[in-house]
Amino acid sequence: MKRDLVLVIDFGGQYNQLIARRVRECNVYCEVHPYNLSVDEIKQMNPKGIIFTGGPNSVYGENSPLCDKAIFELGVPIFGICYGSQLMSHMLGGKVATAPVSEYGKTKVDVNIESKLFEGVSSSTICWMSHTDYIEKAPEGFKVIGKTPVCPVAAMECEDKNLYAVQFHPEVMHTEEGTKMLSNFVYNICGCTGDWKMDSFVEKTIEEVRQKVGNGKVLCALSGGVDSSVAAVLLSRAVGKQLTCVFVDHGLLRKNEGDEVEEIFGPNGQYDLNFIRVNAQERFYEKLAGIEEPEQKRKIIGEEFIRVFEEEAKKIGTVDYLVQGTIYPDVIESGLGKSAVIKSHHNVGGLPDYVDFKEIIEPLRLLFKDEVRKAGLELGIPEKLVFRQPFPGPGLGIRIIGEVTAEKVKIVQDADAIYREEIANAGIDKEIGQYFAALTNMRSVGVMGDERTYDYAIALRAVTTSDFMTAESADLPWEVLGKVTTRIVNEVKGVNRVMYDCTGKPPATIEFE
C-alpha cells in the first residue's frame, strides 16, 4: 500500500532537514526536494501536502529561487514558511517589502485560533522569527491569521485553496507550539493518516530486499557504527548467510571496540551472516608513521581501508550486491532526492569499482539518524550499539593531534574509556550529544609523587546539539570532571594533565582534526 507523502520544497533554508524530521515525528512520511522540482514530477509523486522552506534570499533578488506558479493550481495543500511565505505572497499578487525593523529571535505572535492551522494553539504564542523582508499586504483572497507589532502578516491563509503561510519557523524548538502547527497542517489540512511507522518500514524493507536479492550474494563493509550495523542486521534478516560482512580493524577504534563488534556479529554472535574480521593495525600504523597533517592522515586512512577491503572482497569472489549505510541526510546533501531503496551501480557516484557487483543496496536511504536508531531497536539490536556515540571514519586518527603511533592510540583509548565510563556512571550520557577524549600534541611538566614528569595533556570534549551543524559546550558537573581527571592522570600512563574544551561550534568543529 502506498504511504502518504508530504513534500518539502527546499529554497535554501538551513532548517530544511529539520522540517522533514518534524513532519516524520508526526508519523507522516516526508521527502526534501530542490525548488526546481517540476510540476509534472510533483504530480507523479502524488503528495498529500507541500511545504515551502525558508531561505536566505529576497523574492526580489535577481537570482532568487522561484517555483512554477502552476504548483498553486494542483489542488494540493501548501504551507509556506518564512521565505516560502513571502514567495507565496509575491507569486499570487501580494506585496513583500523590507521590514522597518528586522525580527530575529523569540517573538510573541497573535494568531487566529479559528484557523485549522492554529487549532489547539494559544491565541498569543511564542514563535521564532528570522527575517528582514516581510509580507506587507496579503494576496487577494487571503485572510490574515497572525500578526506582530512589526509584522502585519505574520500568518495568512486562503482556506478555499488550502494555502497557508507563516513568517516564523514552526519547525524550531524555540517556536513553542510549532509541532502542533505542523501536525495541524498534515492532519487537519492535508488529511494524512499517520502511516509512517518504523515497524512497518522494517518489515517492508526486509521483504523488498529479499525479493530483490533472491539467491544472490551480498557484501557489506561493517564499521561497527550505528548505520552500518543496522544495515547489516536488516540484510541479515532478509537473506541470512547470503550476506558477508567485512570488518576492517584499523587499530584506531575505541578501547575494546573491535572485540565488541566481533562479539555481536561474529561466529558466536546472534546474527545469521558470514563475518570476516581483518586485523590490519600494523598496516595502518606503518602508513601513518611520520604524518602529522590532518587531511593527509584522513586520506591515508581512507585509501588504506579501501585497499584492505578490496583484498578481502577479491578473496570472496563475485558478489551480486554491495550494501551501503547511506542515510537520508546524505541523499539530501547530494541533491539526488530520490527515494528508491535499491538502485543500480552506475547511477551512484563514488562507489568502489574494484568490487565486481551488479547493484547497490541502501536499506536506510529513507531514514534520518534518529530513525536509524529506532529501526535498530525494532530489529532487536542491543541499546549499547544503537546509541553508540558518533565516531568519525578515520577513528582515533583524528583524535590524536600530530603523528599517530601505537603508544598514542593506547593512551587516548584508555583516557576515552574512563571518560565514557564516568559520564555513564553519572547518568548524563543521554543528555550529551557527543563526548570523547583527544590526545593533544602538547607535553607539559608535572609532579607525580616526588618525581618530575614531562607527559601529554588530554583534552576532554562534550557538546550538546540537535543536528551537529551547530553545538554548544556541555556544562558538565565539576564533580564528574574532577573524577575523570583524577582517574586519567592516575590510571593512564603518559598523561599528567587534563583539559576541558569549552568551545562551541562555530567557531570550532566538534572533532579536533
Curated annotation (Swiss-Prot):
The active site is at C82, H169, E171. Pathway: Purine metabolism; GMP biosynthesis; GMP from XMP (L-Gln route): step 1/1. Residues 5-195 form the Glutamine amidotransferase type-1 domain. Its EC number is 6.3.5.2. ATP binds at S223, G224, G225, V226, D227, S228, S229. InterPro entries: Class_I_gatase-like, GATASE, GMP_synth_C, GMP_synth_GATase, GMP_synthase, GMPS_ATP_PPase_dom, Rossmann-like_a/b/a_fold. The keyword Hydrolase does not apply. Catalyzes the synthesis of GMP from XMP. This is GMP synthase [glutamine-hydrolyzing]. The gene is guaA.
